[in-house]
Swiss-Prot record:
<dbReference type="InterPro" id="IPR005227">
    <property type="entry name" value="YqgF"/>
</dbReference>
<dbReference type="InterPro" id="IPR037027">
    <property type="entry name" value="YqgF/RNaseH-like_dom_sf"/>
</dbReference>
<keyword id="KW-0378">Hydrolase</keyword>
<dbReference type="GO" id="GO:0004518">
    <property type="term" value="F:nuclease activity"/>
</dbReference>
<dbReference type="InterPro" id="IPR006641">
    <property type="entry name" value="YqgF/RNaseH-like_dom"/>
</dbReference>
<keyword id="KW-0963">Cytoplasm</keyword>
<dbReference type="GO" id="GO:0000967">
    <property type="term" value="P:rRNA 5'-end processing"/>
</dbReference>
<keyword id="KW-0690">Ribosome biogenesis</keyword>
<dbReference type="GO" id="GO:0005829">
    <property type="term" value="C:cytosol"/>
</dbReference>
<dbReference type="Pfam" id="PF03652">
    <property type="entry name" value="RuvX"/>
</dbReference>
<dbReference type="InterPro" id="IPR012337">
    <property type="entry name" value="RNaseH-like_sf"/>
</dbReference>
<protein>
    <recommendedName>
        <fullName>Putative pre-16S rRNA nuclease</fullName>
        <ecNumber>3.1.-.-</ecNumber>
    </recommendedName>
</protein>
<comment type="similarity">
    <text>Belongs to the YqgF nuclease family.</text>
</comment>
<comment type="function">
    <text>Could be a nuclease involved in processing of the 5'-end of pre-16S rRNA.</text>
</comment>
<keyword id="KW-0540">Nuclease</keyword>
Length: 137
């Protein structure tokens, strides 16, 4: 039976979101959430979780290219812990190195420079995080 998974691309001003099913291994971008210094509107996240009823959540883990942690790493881990605490769903962290670069390249390829809107980049980054998580399973 297919499991629904939600993924998040954590950021201090915007949090990308994507949904996917493990049976297909593909993800679809959802609208991004605005955040204030990394704090989202939890009611908006709750609404998406209620709508999609995921079995687990995946949060992108920002790391330096050499695999070491960066300042945003701890904040992403804290966000993952809060998701788990608020919604009582299993949360996994997924290495997100280069997802933003890949997302920008994908958007640029589709629509050129004008298409590079931040919320689209965050949603596609969340898709790439989820798809890489599926591949690692």
């Amino acid at each position: 039976m297919a499991r629904t998974i939600l993924a998040f691309d954590f950021g201090t001003y915007s949090i990308g979101c994507a949904v996917g099913q493990d049976i297909t291994g593909t993800a679809q971008g959802l609208p991004s959430f605005k955040a204030q210094d990394g704090i989202p509107n939890w009611d908006q996240i709750e609404k998406v979780i209620k709508e999609w009823q995921p079995e687990r959540l995946v949060v992108g883990l920002p790391l330096n290219m050499d695999g070491t942690e960066q300042p945003l790493t701890q904040r992403a881990k804290k966000f993952a812990n809060r998701l788990n605490g608020r919604f009582n769903l299993p949360v996994e962290l997924q290495d997100e190195r280069l997802t933003t670069v890949s997302a920008k390249a994908e958007i640029f390829e589709r629509g050129g420079y004008k298409a590079l809107k931040k919320d689209k980049v965050d949603s596609i980054s969340a898709c790439l995080i989820l798809e890489s998580w599926f591949e690692a399973q």
